[in-house]
Amino acid sequence: MESPAGRTPAPGALPYYVAFSQLLGLTVVAVTGAWLGAYRGGIAWESALQFNVHPLCMIIGLVFLQGDALLVYRVFRNEAKRTTKILHGLLHVLAFVIALVGLVAVFDYHRKKGIADLYSLHSWCGILVFVLFLAQWLVGLGFFLFPGASFSLRSRYRPQHVFFGAAIFLLSVGTALLGLKEALLFQLGTKYSAFESEGVLANVLGLLLVAFGAVVLYILTRADWKRPLQAEEQALSMDFKTLTEGDSPSSQ
């Protein structure tokens, strides 16, 4: 049902779930900063603290901002489709740039310390996430922002784009959990099992990551919370149906 101004109102519970997701996401970032500040000495580029740039940037970029980019089409329900696309794409660009800083930080730190690269499951999953994220963005840019792709191609690719977007986000959350556990085992060793305060805080951070991922995924999978088709999108959809199925208004 549309409002008198022609705008489709958001479903009743959607704004509350979106607000809850933002509260969780900001808390994840804050707790990450608190963990690194209180127990790891903070962050810096030209010192032993350079490694700490990595988890902070990855959490902000590939978890929080990527999650927000996926929610754009649920939050902005009545704005022009192209405007929403651009915001969706720009949030992904920002997430990519921040994640790239985090990736450079950890490789540079390893080089300075003589530590081997890409031997752990966390690092393998991290590289996979980064490559998939970049590929997803580039393909999405070609299909949905540049005018070259036809409506039929966009319609056929859209389900894959939606699926891989959610899959990459969940893989990002899982990779962050692997990295968190790896860092705790390296730093605490056997003290981890003694309920050290750092370990407890990091475990809370892990639960917050899971909660943020779960709430974002729930919002994305609610079919009744999808962005409604605008008038021009409905017209294009009808034209595509006419071309592919052979029906026309006169045959109804």
UniProtKB/Swiss-Prot annotation:
Catalysed conversion reaction: monodehydro-L-ascorbate radical(out) + L-ascorbate(in) = monodehydro-L-ascorbate radical(in) + L-ascorbate(out)
Membrane topology (Cytoplasmic): 1-17, 74-85, 147-159, 221-252
PROSITE patterns, alphabetized: CYTOCHROME_B561
Pfam families: Cytochrom_B561 (PF03188)
Modified residues (Phosphoserine): 248, 250
Subcellular location(s) per record: Cytoplasmic vesicle, Secretory vesicle, Chromaffin granule membrane
Keyword field: Acetylation, Cytoplasmic vesicle, Electron transport, Heme, Iron, Membrane, Metal-binding, Phosphoprotein, Translocase, Transmembrane, Transmembrane helix, Transport
Transmembrane intervals: 18-38, 53-73, 86-106, 126-146, 160-180, 200-220
GO terms assigned for molecular function: metal ion binding; oxidoreductase activity; transmembrane monodehydroascorbate reductase activity
Example GO biological process: ascorbate homeostasis
Residue positions, PTM N-acetylmethionine: 1
Membrane association type: Multi-pass membrane protein
Residue ranges annotated for the Cytochrome b561 domain, each copy included: 20-221
Primary residence: membrane
Cofactor annotation comment: Binds 2 heme b groups non-covalently.
EC number from the UniProt entry: 7.2.1.-
GO cellular component, one term: chromaffin granule membrane
Positions annotated to bind L-ascorbate: 81, 85, 154
Residue positions binding heme b 1: 54, 117-120, 122, 182
InterPro entries reported in the protein's UniProt record: CYB561/CYBRD1-like, Cyt_b561/ferric_Rdtase_TM
Topology feature Vesicular, residues: 39-52, 107-125, 181-199
Binding site for heme b 2: 74, 81, 88, 161, 226
Cofactors, names only: heme b
Enzyme class: translocase
Purpose of the protein: Transmembrane reductase that uses ascorbate as an electron donor in the cytoplasm and transfers electrons across membranes to reduce monodehydro-L-ascorbate radical in the lumen of secretory vesicles. It is therefore involved the regeneration and homeostasis within secretory vesicles of ascorbate which in turn provides reducing equivalents needed to support the activity of intravesicular enzymes.
Name used for this protein in its record: Transmembrane ascorbate-dependent reductase CYB561
Organism this protein belongs to: Sus scrofa
Lineage of origin: Eukaryota, Metazoa, Chordata, Craniata, Vertebrata
The encoding gene: CYB561
